From Swiss-Prot:
The keyword Nucleus applies. SMART domains: PAX. Residues 82-130 are annotated as: RED subdomain. Residues 7-63 are annotated as: PAI subdomain. Residues 4-130 bind DNA. The lineage of its organism: Eukaryota, Metazoa, Chordata, Craniata, Vertebrata. It comes from Saimiri boliviensis boliviensis (Bolivian squirrel monkey). Its main location: nucleus. PROSITE patterns: PAIRED_1, PAIRED_2. Transcription factor required for normal development of thymus, parathyroid glands, ultimobranchial bodies, teeth, skeletal elements of skull and larynx as well as distal limbs. Keywords: Developmental protein, DNA-binding, Nucleus, Paired box, Transcription, Transcription regulation. This is Paired box protein Pax-9. One of its GO terms (cellular component) is nucleus.
């Protein structure tokens, strides 16, 4: 039965391009050739091209077969599971091996012979399609095995959680009412505790130390200086605030900046604006000072023209300060007036 589709050759015969000639026509060509008919006459009689007749007769004379296909059958399959297994083993042992080296090893190990050994292109295709993904998966598994176990996640800003003066002070001092509490991990940035840092070598104070001094809260480093505060000095007498101590402090304030011991005259009030003071009484140089020792401040040797050793600023000594010399002078004056009368 002839196919329903095809092309017509130059002899008027019908053929299908790319398809072999039917077996019946092949057998008829061989029978006519055995009868002694020339190939050209067979071609005209059967309407088959001269090339097709010559090719079929030549194959029949060589192999004795009229069937189409490769002579001696197709090449057997060479990419067997055993060959693929050996190729995978070679690749795992030496990841940088070439395809032609794998081919030589297959021949050297006796896995294949020269008739069924795969070609270099076939080995490359096997490495790319079948072993490539497995090799990548093996590398990934080995990486996961050698990778250390993940550590538990730490909260933010606790990577370098080292003790610092700020956190220690915050732990000791309670938060005052009305002020929101600040977590210790967010209050101040962490500093790397190293004894070989530049600030430690040069003796420069770190930022946390400066902030701890300026902060209103009490820090451990400030506790060392608390013993030297003014609160531990004995309190001065109340009368000394308005008396001699006040004048001595004013003298220290006015004359403390004077160069070479000279007074700063421009900082004084003019003499015309000051009221005249009464003449001080004569006081014996031997008297007892009853003020608190903490209120005494040494003044400069320079004194005002109208002042006395007891009042450098020409001020009266308050009556609350009792001096034995003044009492003796007053008693002597009263006795003189009484005798005169």
């Amino acid at each position: 039965m002839e196919p329903a589709f095809g092309e017509v050759n130059q002899l008027g015969g019908v053929f299908v391009n790319g398809r072999p000639l039917p077996n019946a026509i092949r057998l008829r060509i061989v029978e006519l050739a055995q009868l002694g008919i020339r190939p050209c006459d067979i071609s005209r009689q059967l309407r088959v091209s001269h090339g097709c007749v010559s090719k079929i007769l030549a194959r029949y004379n060589e192999t004795g077969s009229i069937l189409p296909g490769a002579i001696g059958g197709s090449k057997p399959r060479v990419t067997t599971p055993t060959v693929v297994k050996h190729i995978r083993t070679y690749k795992q042992r030496d990841p940088g091996i070439f395809a032609w080296e794998i081919r030589d090893r297959l021949l050297a190990d006796g896995v294949c012979d020269k008739y069924n050994v795969p070609s270099v292109s076939s080995i490359s295709r096997i490495l790319r399609n079948k072993i490539g993904n497995l090799a990548q998966q093996g590398h990934y598994d080995s990486y996961k095995q050698h990778q250390p176990a993940p550590q538990p996640a730490l909260p933010y800003n606790h990577i370098y959680s080292y003790p610092s003066p700020i956190t220690a002070a915050a732990a000791k001092v309670p938060t005052p009412p009305g002020v929101p509490a600040i977590p210790g991990s967010v209050a101040m940035p962490r500093t790397w505790p190293s004894s070989h840092s530049v600030t430690d070598i040069l003796g420069i104070r770190s930022i946390t130390d400066q902030v701890s001094d300026s902060s209103p809260y009490h820090s451990p480093k400030v506790e060392e200086w608390s013993s030297l505060g003014r609160s531990n000095f004995p309190a001065a007498a109340p009368h000394a605030v308005n008396g001699l101590e006040k004048g001595a402090l004013e003298q220290e304030t006015k004359y403390g900046q004077a160069p070479n011991g000279l007074p700063a005259v421009g900082s004084f009030v003019s003499a015309s604006s000051m009221a005249p003071y009464p003449t001080p009484a004569q006081v014996s140089p031997y008297m007892t000072y009853s003020a608190a020792p903490s209120g005494y401040v040494a003044g400069h040797g320079w004194q005002h023209a109208g002042s006395t050793p007891l009042s450098p600023h020409n001020c009266d000594i308050p009556a609350s300060l009792a001096f034995k010399g003044m009492q003796a002078a007053r008693e002597g004056s009263h006795s003189v007036t009484a005798s005169a009368l």
